[in-house]
């Protein structure tokens, strides 16, 4: 059987409820809270398997990682729909993650950025924008 890649798959595989999953963070080794377990799947992260052990990423480490990548590996900025030309793909096909929390943006979030002429950033050859949740606190 293939190894689970999502928290809900791991819980199902172990035949336990999600709130009983003890998932260490790959970066700080602290255990993810129940809220972070739910956010992990919502943000479309994948579990990391090392030597038969499974790891995730807590919210604090995701924020730190996003900040580190942005400050050290930022490449360019495009405004709104210009992203289609730079990426040579349709907006629906372009993978964009949140610049702040690393959540994978859905189509409505990407279209909203385009409609409001907000910025997309290319960081480490991957596209970033600000998700609806982080835009509220921005």
From Swiss-Prot:
Location (main, coarse): host cell
GO BP terms: DNA-templated transcription; regulation of DNA-templated transcription; symbiont-mediated perturbation of host apoptosis; symbiont-mediated perturbation of host ubiquitin-like protein modification; symbiont-mediated suppression of host innate immune response; symbiont-mediated suppression of host type I interferon-mediated signaling pathway
One of the record's GO molecular function terms: DNA binding
Record-linked InterPro entries: E6, E6_sf
Location relative to the cell: Host cytoplasm; Host nucleus
ZnF unnamed span: 25-61, 98-134
Signal sequence, start to end: none
Annotated GO CC locations: host cell cytoplasm; host cell nucleus
Residue ranges of coiled coil: none
Record key words, sorted: Activator, DNA-binding, Early protein, Host cytoplasm, Host nucleus, Host-virus interaction, Inhibition of host innate immune response by virus, Metal-binding, Modulation of host cell apoptosis by virus, Transcription, Transcription regulation, Viral immunoevasion, Zinc, Zinc-finger
A Pfam family it matches: E6
Function: Plays a major role in the induction and maintenance of cellular transformation. E6 associates with host UBE3A/E6-AP ubiquitin-protein ligase and modulates its activity. Protects host keratinocytes from apoptosis by mediating the degradation of host BAK1. May also inhibit host immune response.
Family designation: Belongs to the papillomaviridae E6 protein family.
Subunit-structure text: Forms homodimers. Interacts with ubiquitin-protein ligase UBE3A/E6-AP; this interaction stimulates UBE3A ubiquitin activity. Interacts with host BAK1.
Protein name listed in UniProt: Protein E6
Organism this protein belongs to: Human papillomavirus type 49
